[in-house]
Amino acid sequence: MSKPSRHRFEQVFANLKIAVEAAGGVMADIVKLNYFLAAEVDQADVPKMRPIRDRYLDVAKPPASTFVAVSRLMRPGWLIEIEAVAAIDD
């Protein structure tokens, strides 16, 4: 995995952690992840993303997840987008 891709994937998870915690939750509250990968992402790099993901999520009980390859994302230059669903107690 190229350094820019690794850095971007790391940044996406760091941002996700900030968002979940701002909502009063923790990363273990995430029950579903949808990964959207732009066509520029080498599909051979997808398995290499797992160690980064594993630093943020409970590897013993990971959330359900789906990977979707798309022609492009909302903004030029975006390569990875993650949609998360979390079950956060009040």
Report the location of each language-model feature.
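Short, polar/acidic, helix-capping and beta-turn segments at strand->helix junctions
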Residues: 1-90
